[in-house]
Amino acid sequence: MSSGSKPTNKSKLIRELIRKFPGYTKTDLARIAIEKYPLIFDDVERTRAIIRYVTDSIGESNRKRNKQFEEYTLPESRAKERQFYRIERKNILWLSDIHIPNQNNQAIELAVQYGVERNVDCIVLGGDIMDNTPFTSHDAPPPSPDDVRDFFDMTEQFLGWLRSKLPKAQIVWIEGNHDNWLMRWLMKKAPILFNDPYYHLPQRLNLKQYNIEFLEQHIILQMGKLYGSHGHTVVKGVFAPVNAARGVFVKTKSNYIIGHCHSSSAHSESNIKEDAIGCWSVGCLCELSPSYDPHNTKHNLGFARIVVENNGDFTVENKRIFKGRIV
């Protein structure tokens, strides 16, 4: 047979031998073919020519297939790294869950005066500064336009009052779930307004005028070796009703402080290196039995003071307010 002939039956037999003896040289395959099929293959060189034809055909097919998939690449990842915001100041007052217009003014005044007397140089507004219940799924009567304006005006009035009490302090506002309800409502019900920055809290409340920085809910505060956030992304499900601080520990395995739960709690454990890990939840500064949760008896008024040392170590004063007194 000439090297240019292409008998199908011979090609089929050669392909079977290639699959059966992978890695063998063409000469070895030719000898196996002659030994196995002496009536079909009788010459080493002619058999090698058939093998070259078959392997070139297979190779071309593989090359075409590989070239096709060479055009594919991994899609660009949109994954984001966890974001932190470091507070460099060392004497911090934590106020959270004020829920304007349902705030407790007496408790707010006590907490802020406590900070003023101790020369705090930073205030963390730990989320849910506004209530925004009409913008969520809770059963609530729809607000009038005047009510909505009042929500913003009252919140701005509070921010102005707070700045007047501590004019040189850094103020950082962490977005809470109630703060975010307005944006979620706009996104679903009024997307045109959602796309207008004027209706976002930082602009609508003139935060720049009061030198207040607003952090979105996914950003984590870092105060020395202590971390913090509003808490609604931390204590979900079964943890909140039992011991919020323990739920924070189970979730974060870090020194961590939250608001959100409207109750003061603490939990500490040590790791295998005997490093102490502490977690806290801070009480609220608003009504204790809101209309959407009228039977709750676990809420308490409270705030916290955090003192950070130069090496990052810290102390947390997790204060309660009971019958007009700080305890």
Over which residues does each language-model region extend?
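DNA-recognition alpha helix
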Residues: D28-I40
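Structural motif
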Residues: K90-I92, D121-V124, L226, N255-I257
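Conserved beta-sheet core of the metallophosphoesterase superfamily
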Residues: L226-K319
